[in-house]
Amino acid sequence: MNFETVIGLEVHVELNTNSKIFSPTSAHFGNDQNANTNVIDWSFPGVLPVLNKGVVDAGIKAALALNMDIHKKMHFDRKNYFYPDNPKAYQISQFDEPIGYNGWIEVELEDGTTKKIGIERAHLEEDAGKNTHGTDGYSYVDLNRQGVPLIEIVSEADMRSPEEAYAYLTALKEVIQYAGISDVKMEEGSMRVDANISLRPYGQEKFGTKTELKNLNSFSNVRKGLEYEVQRQAEILRSGGQIRQETRRYDEANKATILMRVKEGAADYRYFPEPDLPLFEISDEWIEEMRTELPEFPKERRARYVSDLGLSDYDASQLTANKVTSDFFEKAVALGGDAKQVSNWLQGEVAQFLNAEGKTLEQIELTPENLVEMIAIIEDGTISSKIAKKVFVHLAKNGGGAREYVEKAGMVQISDPAVLIPIIHQVFADNEAAVADFKSGKRNADKAFTGFLMKATKGQANPQVALKLLAQELAKLKEN
């Protein structure tokens, strides 16, 4: 029997506000343990939450970016559970009336087709702290993350393969990043994914029993975990067994999913309205204000890069996959840089340098201004493409002006015939054997002089000018 795969994803996105959702403490990542905490985060008796307006702003932007309806009257709920990283013994979240609902996103699949994936809801909530189990036998609680604002985006069960799930996450990450509400860095926990997967016989409308997957710390592991589950569940069903509703984690080392616990239902959390927070009204004016702050999204940018700038679909897709790269490209073109040349550098030398150094574009000294200047001095013949690679490395590490560096470092290309011709004559004088081979008609003897000339000029001869002059002088040499 063959089965249809049914996948839905729950994505937690950490919002990039300066402070937490219900307390004024810093929400920034990377500080010392428990440095970003106060009495609200520790749940001292008598403290009350105060909603951060910036979190609602971000929630509205997310809902608009994902084509969602917005609840004009919004409230929060308590989700009750006990765990050491949750001092209140409940989480403030949204249950029956999330900020956004009934949305969708269009994703591009590997075969070039597109598919619309439904989004059931997007709700605001606070993050929990973090438990660390030490080798000394003690467990430690860090509450820096406690109260950091999250938006949980819950898709419809519209994906039919691990590949579609991967494409959905890629598109979702792009949209959230472009909306400016999160840096969506999985390595820092600002984007976390849980997957729900079930199988059913083809033609059956009723969903099968779902399994939830956790510990999916990369898009690649999401795909691998889902691929494993497809095989595991299919084998159980074909052998006459039943799938249990459970939570499993993906073990990267063993490339398998492992049982964590039997899955809880919503009733286990005993949701009820948060009594310490009022009902919040979101006006049409507020929504429209947030709409005006949204930028051009990747799909629209890709289309413009192709139609207005003449880039290929591939180049446009690569440039817009990351907002930082796309914004850099936009500024470079606005400064007068040739779109194709800027694109080639960003996808070629720049990308290779970043991979080798383990850095991002924001972490190096290259700017749109000095990249455009470097491309300009390649085009006007000041430097060759070969020299430009060395210039780029200097700019990436040290910044500064491209032309100024080239002149100070003595890298200016030699293009003046009055300078090159005497050097060519000296090359002839220094390589009498090669001259004799050339005059005798030895095959490809002329090729050696190109290397001699570039060596004599330390690679600074303008190749086009130098080759033309060399051919001219060799012709004269043959006549004599």
Curated annotation (Swiss-Prot):
Keyword Phosphoprotein belongs to the record: no
SMART domains associated with the record: GatB_Yqey
Keyword entries, A-Z: ATP-binding, Ligase, Nucleotide-binding, Protein biosynthesis
GO MF entry, a single one: asparaginyl-tRNA synthase (glutamine-hydrolyzing) activity
Keyword Ribosomal protein: no
GO BP: glutaminyl-tRNAGln biosynthesis via transamidation; translation
Reactions that this protein is recorded to catalyse: L-glutamyl-tRNA(Gln) + L-glutamine + ATP + H2O = L-glutaminyl-tRNA(Gln) + L-glutamate + ADP + phosphate + H(+); L-aspartyl-tRNA(Asn) + L-glutamine + ATP + H2O = L-asparaginyl-tRNA(Asn) + L-glutamate + ADP + phosphate + 2 H(+)
EC number, UniProt record: 6.3.5.-
Highest taxon above the source species: Bacteria
SUPFAM superfamilies, A to Z: GatB/YqeY motif, Glutamine synthetase/guanido kinase
Assembly notes: Heterotrimer of A, B and C subunits.
Cross-referenced NCBIfam families: gatB (TIGR00133), PRK05477.1-1 (NF004011), PRK05477.1-2 (NF004012), PRK05477.1-4 (NF004014)
Protein purpose: Allows the formation of correctly charged Asn-tRNA(Asn) or Gln-tRNA(Gln) through the transamidation of misacylated Asp-tRNA(Asn) or Glu-tRNA(Gln) in organisms which lack either or both of asparaginyl-tRNA or glutaminyl-tRNA synthetases. The reaction takes place in the presence of glutamine and ATP through an activated phospho-Asp-tRNA(Asn) or phospho-Glu-tRNA(Gln).
Family to which this protein belongs: Belongs to the GatB/GatE family. GatB subfamily.
HAMAP family, per the entry: GatB (MF_00121)
Cross-referenced PANTHER family: GLUTAMYL-TRNA GLN AMIDOTRANSFERASE SUBUNIT B MITOCHONDRIAL AND PROKARYOTIC PET112-RELATED (PTHR11659), GLUTAMYL-TRNA(GLN) AMIDOTRANSFERASE SUBUNIT B, MITOCHONDRIAL (PTHR11659:SF0)
Protein name as annotated: Aspartyl/glutamyl-tRNA(Asn/Gln) amidotransferase subunit B
Annotated organism of origin: Streptococcus pneumoniae (strain Taiwan19F-14)
